[in-house]
């Protein structure tokens, strides 16, 4: 069995009533809702790959603000280990690669995510995600 390393992004932004989480549909099965993820290119860090996947799959420019967790799965004859990061953005995103996008509250995202392993990842990371989503970008200040 071939083994592959991937990176993924749990994309968050602040909404009027709290953090919103971006889900995308899977390219191979548009009924499956997931977090953007994919291969790590040669010489690329996991964090850089997560940011690139957010851009490629969701049209999001963002910044890694923390670790979210790891998940392993098998697909066909391959084994994958995905390292997820929380990527914070202020953007809306843009549907790309034939994928749909949805900004959801935490409980809505749990219901929409297709795979139990991904729901577990979100549950485990949620306390950190709330903190990361609320943290202002370094160097930015509120106007008085």
Positions of PLM-derived features:
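Structural detector for helix-capping/boundary residues
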Residues: 7, 38, 52, 104-107
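The catalytic Nudix box helix
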Residues: 35-68
């Amino acid at each position: 069995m071939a083994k592959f390393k991937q990176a993924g992004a749990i994309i968050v932004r602040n909404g009027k009533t709290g953090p919103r989480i971006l889900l995308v549909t899977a390219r191979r099965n548009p009924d499956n809702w997931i977090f953007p993820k994919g291969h790590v290119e040669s010489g690329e860090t996991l964090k850089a790959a997560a940011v690139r996947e957010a851009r490629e799959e969701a049209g999001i420019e963002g910044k890694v603000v923390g670790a979210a967790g790891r998940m392993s799965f098998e697909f066909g004859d391959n084994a994958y280990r995905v390292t997820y990061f929380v990527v914070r953005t202020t953007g809306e995103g843009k549907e790309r690669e034939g994928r749909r996008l949805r900004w959801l509250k935490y409980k809505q995202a749990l219901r929409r995510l297709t795979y139990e392993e991904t729901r577990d990842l979100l549950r485990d990371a949620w306390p950190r995600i709330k903190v990361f989503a609320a943290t202002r970008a370094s160097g930015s200040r509120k106007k008085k």
